């Protein structure tokens, strides 16, 4: 396959994916750079194990506390008495910083919510959003956390399908430069990448467990979505490598949704999804094949023009969930009794991202969450982080790491996909899983949530399960909170998804 042809493919995907920047905030130039890098190495490249080997030999500096901070006292200072505008709750919540490199002044922000009941025995779960450079507070306040934000941008309401009904949930803003996380050393922000992020997350976790020692030895899980398809397995492998020292972490499994797993299959999988859902016409696909997908492609301009047409056809929809509307008017509105009655977790709010930004940039909110006064506003995603991310890391396959994790009998690996996402659609994930040569131990069957089909699932040897969620987009807990909680509950309990209503 020639470079000109590859370039046209990446141009097309660039235009398709740029519309998705409304959530991930990745700039057009950044996406182009990433995809151009992929085209240069070729789409037919075999799955390599470079990243697995890098994780195996990842050097993590000593996470020992050298600042003289009393961790118990710091934990007490991290306690959040109440978030502004929150309803009353029965669980404790904490927010604060853990320094992962004292000489550089590099600190990561966390928000932690205890389980609603039996918190002393339930496991600890670390949640990571993707990007790279997107805040996990989005997951906390828009997806699986205990609160959602009303349209006034200052009042919270309860999420009855919060994952802290099942476990203690720790949200981490990483890598440095994401959300409220910061560094005093400018060079920390210049060359971000997977290895640095994995090392910082591991150091954070070890030091956080010193602050919250009651969770040492507790069952521990890592979950996340999107580019956390890199973060989660890399951190899991890092933990296993370093568990031989005194900082043992009782890792029992990983859960990743709509994940970036293998760069090679993203092109074919994306086209497959768009055509199968009538979002890309057969004529456009045929024209693409005739103009661009040949050994002697036509003039470059033909491919660019076709890419522009495809982009124009789909750019007005929500590419993160093709069944939901886009945000048209993001103006904050006063809260009334009527608006309270009309707002529920089960009703998708297309402008929810704007409500989060308004809430987290309030001075009283940041004060209650123990946020250091930063010279910039909180943003859902840091464009510079995504733009500067190591291109080799972007293109690395996570499949070898997943297969390595499957060798550990005590670990379970679950992957799930919302089936109305076009950014990382189920066809991309299914192509990637096919490359793993998994051995199925069950049929492809429907699973149920509260009497209705929640999606389809299949289990494989090696404690590996794949599940789809019907009607859910890129952020499954946002669009289908009931089904997401059912899936999470069975993952934590290590039980099969319900196969009967």
Swiss-Prot record:
- Active site positions, chain numbering: 226, 421, 474
Q: Does the keyword Zinc-finger apply?
A: no
* Cellular component, GO annotation: extracellular region
**EC number per UniProt:** 3.4.16.-
SS bonds (residue pairs): 134-381, 292-303, 327-351
Record-level GO BP terms = proteolysis
Which controlled-vocabulary keywords does the entry list? Carboxypeptidase, Disulfide bond, Glycoprotein, Hydrolase, Protease, Secreted, Signal
The GO molecular function terms of this record are: serine-type carboxypeptidase activity
Query: Which InterPro entries does the entry mention?
Result: AB_hydrolase_fold, Peptidase_S10, Ser_caboxypep_his_AS, Ser_caboxypep_ser_AS
Sites carrying sugar chains: 65, 101, 329, 337, 390, 437
Signal peptide from the UniProt entry: 1-25
Q: What class of enzyme is it?
A: hydrolase
Which Pfam families does UniProt cross-reference here?
Answer: Peptidase_S10
List the PANTHER family.
Answer: SERINE CARBOXYPEPTIDASE-LIKE 36-RELATED (PTHR11802:SF132), SERINE PROTEASE FAMILY S10 SERINE CARBOXYPEPTIDASE (PTHR11802)
Q: What is this protein called?
A: Serine carboxypeptidase-like 39
This chain is encoded by the gene named SCPL39
């Amino acid at each position: 396959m020639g470079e000109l042809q590859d370039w046209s493919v990446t141009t097309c995907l660039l235009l398709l994916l740029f519309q998705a920047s409304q959530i991930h905030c990745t700039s057009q130039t950044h996406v182009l750079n990433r995809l151009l890098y992929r085209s240069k190495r070729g789409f037919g490249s075999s799955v390599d194990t470079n990243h697995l080997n890098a994780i195996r030999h990842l050097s993590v500096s000593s996470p020992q506390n050298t600042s003289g901070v009393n961790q118990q006292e710091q934990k007490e200072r991290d306690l959040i008495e109440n978030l502004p505008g929150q309803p009353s709750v029965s669980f404790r919540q904490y927010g604060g910083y853990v320094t992962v490199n004292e000489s550089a002044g590099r600190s990561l922000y966390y928000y932690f919510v205890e389980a609603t009941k039996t918190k002393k025995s339930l496991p600890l779960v670390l949640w990571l959003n993707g990007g790279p450079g997107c805040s996990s507070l989005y997951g906390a306040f828009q997806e699986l956390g205990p609160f959602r934000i009303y349209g006034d941008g200052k009042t919270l309401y309860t999420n009855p399908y919060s994952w802290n009904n099942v476990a203690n949930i720790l949200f981490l803003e990483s890598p440095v430069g994401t959300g409220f996380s910061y560094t005093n050393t400018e060079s920390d922000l210049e060359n971000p990448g997977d290895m640095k992020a994995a090392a910082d997350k591991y150091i954070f976790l070890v030091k956080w467990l010193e602050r919250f020692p009651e969770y040492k030895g507790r069952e521990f899980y890592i979950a996340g979505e999107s580019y956390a398809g890199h973060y989660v397995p890399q951190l899991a492998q890092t933990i296993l490598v370093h568990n031989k020292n005194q900082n043992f972490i009782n890792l029992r499994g990983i859960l990743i949704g709509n994940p970036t797993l293998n760069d090679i299959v993203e092109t074919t999988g994306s086209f497959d999804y768009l055509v199968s859902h009538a979002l890309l016409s057969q004529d456009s696909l045929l024209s693409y094949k005739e103009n661009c997908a040949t050994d002697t492609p036509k003039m470059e301009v033909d491919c660019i023009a076709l890419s522009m047409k495809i982009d124009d056809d789909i750019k007005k929809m929500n590419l993160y969930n093709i069944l939901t509307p886009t945000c048209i008017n993001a103006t904050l509105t006063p809260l009334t009794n009527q608006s309270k009655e009309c707002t529920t977790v089960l009703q998708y709010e297309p402008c929810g991202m704007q409500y989060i930004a308004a809430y987290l940039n309030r001075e009283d909110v940041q004060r209650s969450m123990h946020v250091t006064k930063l010279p910039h506003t909180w943003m859902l995603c840091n464009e510079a982080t995504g733009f500067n991310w190591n291109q080799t890391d972007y293109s690395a396959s996570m499949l070898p790491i997943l297969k390595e994790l499957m060798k550990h009998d005590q670990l379970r690996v679950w992957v799930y996909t919302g089936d109305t996402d076009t950014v990382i659609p189920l066809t991309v994930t299914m192509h990637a899983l096919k490359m793993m040569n998994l051995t199925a131990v069950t049929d492809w069957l429907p699973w149920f949530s509260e009497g209705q089909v929640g999606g389809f699932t299949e289990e494989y040897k090696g404690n590996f399960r794949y599940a789809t969620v019907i009607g859910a987009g890129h952020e499954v807990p946002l669009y289908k909170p009931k089904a997401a909680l059912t899936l999470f509950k069975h993952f934590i309990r290590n039980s099969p998804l319900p196969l009967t209503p």
